[in-house]
Every structure is written in C-alpha cells, then in structure tokens.
Amino acid sequence: MNKAYYIAAGLAAIYAAFYLRKAKAGKKRVAVVGDSLSLSSAGWQNILAGRYGWDIDNFSKIGQTSGQALARFMASSNTYDTVFIFLGANDTYGGINPAFTIDNLKKIIELAKDKGAKTIVIPGILSSKVSSSPEALKYDDLKSKMIYLPGMVVPILRTVDRKDVPDGLHFGAATHKQLADLIDSWSLR
C-alpha cells in the first residue's frame, strides 16, 4: 500500500468520526430551560424530541427571566443527558443588565454540567431581521455575547421570514422548524 492510500483512509476515518456521527435515538433525558420561545406545541423542542425519541422536562415559562429559570432549574434534582438553554428575551425586554443575563446563563451551564449533562445554548433568531425596536437590537447584542459561553452555542438563525414572527419576537411553525433544523445540524450531528 502506498502513502496516499493511508492518508486517504485516515482522512475518511476522521470525517466519519466527526461528521457522520448523530445523536442516537432513544430515551435520552433532555431538559429545556427557556421562556415562551420554548413552549409552543409545534416548537423546536418538540420537533427534535419527535425526531430523536427524547423524554423532555421543559423548565420554560412565559415571561421567565434567566434568573427565574436558574432558580427553577436549580430546584430540580433530576439529571439529564442534554440541557438546551434558550433565554434572554425577557431579560432584554425587561431592561435587565446583559452582564447579569450572561452570568445566569453561565450558572445554568455549570449546574447542568455538574449533573453530567451536555449543554447547548440557543441564541435564537436575528431579531433585527423582524423588528427595528431598540429592544430587538439589544437582544441581538446579548446574543452576540453568548458565543463566548462555555459549551456548545448554536449560531443565530439569520434566514427568518418576518411574516412568521408577527410580533417581532414569537415565531410560528416555519421558523420553529428552521430553528430545529439548525440546532440538529449544528449540535446533534
């Protein structure tokens, strides 16, 4: 065998190991720590649970801030394989200092990892594509800071149809599917 063969075989093995792996279907225990953006019955979390057969504990609540989410998640004694964290909208729209939000997200990540979970932070959509409000711009600024959080951070979904986000914040089924596909391709494959 020649050297080129071994190089090609090695590259193929590396490709297979890192790019063809997929989260195994089955009864993985998954937690979602979020707000109203993670509560839709046709939401990204249920789309992914359907694809992978997960059992989900959803700690999301309408109007929930990162501080409230941290307290709710901290009160749980359950352990999870994966914890999805999708927070920040209510902090931003409520005028909470972004440094506090980032600190709360770090605490949620640390708590999840202490319980043995993989963490996946979801910044969500590019809000300035669907709203020109000052809060939308501040929310995008917060999302840009999330990339420095420990663990996996999904990229911001930038291809959003304004018609599917009528209030500039909450999105419909098409955007939930886009977000589920982005999360799937970025963090689960």
Spell out what each predicted region is.
Residues 37, 75, 127-189:
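Catalytic His-Asp segment of secreted/periplasmic serine-dependent ester chemistry enzymes
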Residues 26-33, 37-107, 127-137, 170:
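Conserved SGNH/GDSL esterase-like catalytic core that processes O-acyl groups on lipids
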Residues 1, 22-29, 78-79, 177-181, ...:
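Acidic, glycine/proline-rich intrinsically disordered low-complexity segments
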Residues 114-119:
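A short helix->loop->beta-strand "cap" motif at the edges of active sites that frequently abuts
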Residues 1-21:
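Single-pass alpha-helical membrane anchors
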Residues 50, 113, 147:
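Anion (oxyanion) recognition and catalysis
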Residues 123-125:
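Short strand-turn motif at the edge of the Rossmann-like AdoMet-binding core
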Residues 108-112:
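Hydrophobic positions in alpha-helices of CheY-like receiver
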